[in-house]
Curated annotation (Swiss-Prot):
A motif ('KMSKS' region) lies at residues 268-272. The gene is cysS. It catalyses: tRNA(Cys) + L-cysteine + ATP = L-cysteinyl-tRNA(Cys) + AMP + diphosphate. Gene3D superfamilies: Cysteine-tRNA ligase, C-terminal anti-codon recognition domain (1.20.120.1910), HUPs (3.40.50.620). This is Cysteine--tRNA ligase. It comes from Prochlorococcus marinus (strain AS9601). GO terms for molecular function: ATP binding; cysteine-tRNA ligase activity; zinc ion binding. Binds 1 zinc ion per subunit.
Amino acid sequence: MIKLFNTLSKKVEVFKPIDDVVKIYCCGVTVYDLCHLGHARSYIAWDVLRRFLIYSDFKVKYVQNFTDIDDKILKRAKEESSSMKEVSEKNIIEFHKDMDSLGIMRPDSMPRATNHICNICSFITILEDKGYAYSRDGDVYYSVFKNKNYGKLSNQNLQEQNINQQGRMVNEENSKKLNPQDFALWKKAKDDEPFFDSPWGKGRPGWHIECSAMVKDELGDTIDIHLGGSDLIFPHHENEIAQSEAANGKKLANYWLHNGMVNVNGQKMSKSLKNFKTIRELIKSGISPMTLRYFVMTVNYRKPLDFTEEALRSASEAWKNINVALSFMDLTKGAFISIDKNESIEEKYKEKISFELSQKKLKFSEALGNDLNTAGAIAIIYDLAKPLKNFLNQFQRVEGFTVELNEKFFLLENFKTLEKLTEVLGLKKEVLVKESKIKEEEISSLINERLKAKMEKNYAKADEIRNLLKEKGIELIDQSKEITTWIRV
């Protein structure tokens, strides 16, 4: 049984699919820049959901869009003296690199807004015909007050809202709108903007209508699960519901799941606070992709994730232990490839081990089935990794170390189970790096020496210290001009 917290009902519900194939739609990125830690948090969570559904014998169709036309993309294109298409294409390629590095399965379909303009226009026309939309001088708006159920996802009070076409809070009313709460379905093109032809003239779609049209085209009127960050509950997902249910006359999604935001040292991650972390920067700084993935899964997807040096270091050490266990076959140099057919193991012992491991698999499924309790699932992973790591400690220290047949059977079965369950979490073996023996006091001393060198503009010496520490397996992370942290790699 799988239970999920449904933002729509505000409670945990037993998951019941509509039919044989679970239909999932996830709001994708606006492709104007590299992905950040918040994106990693979101897409890792939904990757675990998808993997767990497949592990639980569900067939899944997973769709995630690209928003490839938007004010931010147009602004970036202008800054780079390039085109909207060039900016989008470049960042879609970089998106795939980041997601692949984190072990995130590629969606079954990744529609782009610009490829669905005809569907979007048809969708808007339906809303117009039904009286939910109106046009004003080339712009088209959704009339929020026509929809009595508006606000059911976010519990927003229409009387307290004052939102503009993008759904952002403002103080002044747009004179074209019947009400300030109405939002844009189609935007009239400005002189210097790319545009698409439509029944209302040249322009481009609003953000919210893109997803409604793509959900319908890719998955139908009603889907099982709609995913996104908690920052999308309002206005984006609220507006999606308003559009889709008005046009189709059916419920858009049975389950709405939203992940929590990322904080950096207790503060919300944002560009303005200069604590913004891209996935690329984090990995380049020496944090392995699987350490990052493990770190994200230590906290339930709905809760805020606090990115701190201490939490990251703890995750790095924990993942290192699991990674050693996943490297069991490599480290034992083929000694555990199989058990010879002539070697006899008591059936009672086999049954005992099989039962114990089946109980662990059951607890693992119960944890993930309880609203994706990844921390609980990781506890089972750690339990499986422990005997493998303990054995390796002996095996590598004692030359000619031998192992009894029963223990060999236990370790092999334990390893197979570990491999299977880590795959459900998307954790994959990484190349082991010999650990540095340098002490923390020496690291701190060298960091202070490097900071002093930088203040004196002796950058050659600063680089020399960085390289020295790197040779010893220590990667420095410059948080600011005055603050440098480190991790073992």
